[in-house]
Amino acid sequence: MTGEYRMAKDIGLGVKPPRRECDDPNCPFHGNLRVRGMILEGVVVSDRMDKTVIVEREYYRYDRKYERWERRRSRIPAHNPPCIDAQEGDKVRIAECRPLSKTKSFVVIEVLERAQER
């Protein structure tokens, strides 16, 4: 962290920038990372990795043969910038970006609800 405060840039998605500042080059607000594509919501189920969280989202799929809806889930690794600092149990919004690693192509852009508030 530097001494002076850098203004967070607008990422074009209508989300409020975080109050904290970071020096992460892969932060969409304070770094050089561009976001584009899908915007998803889910719950953080793991935050044990460094600057990475696993976001789980549930969705429903219709099975025509049995005429029923089945509940499915997907687990998406996402980059967690230090200025956002999402923790396990938080409801977050993630946005697609360029591939950051072999499995990470999403970044956390907003914490919708903290775990202790739920």
Curated annotation (Swiss-Prot):
SUPFAM superfamilies: Nucleic acid-binding proteins. One of its GO terms (biological process) is translation. The keyword Signal does not apply. Keywords: Ribonucleoprotein, Ribosomal protein, RNA-binding, rRNA-binding. One of its GO terms (cellular component) is cytosolic small ribosomal subunit. One of its GO terms (molecular function) is structural constituent of ribosome. The keyword RNA-binding applies. Pfam families: Ribosomal_S17 (PF00366). It comes from the Archaea. One of the primary rRNA binding proteins, it binds specifically to the 5'-end of 16S ribosomal RNA. Part of the 30S ribosomal subunit. Belongs to the universal ribosomal protein uS17 family. This is Small ribosomal subunit protein uS17. It comes from Methanopyrus kandleri (strain AV19 / DSM 6324 / JCM 9639 / NBRC 100938). The lineage of its organism: Archaea, Methanobacteriati, Methanobacteriota, Methanomada group, Methanopyri.
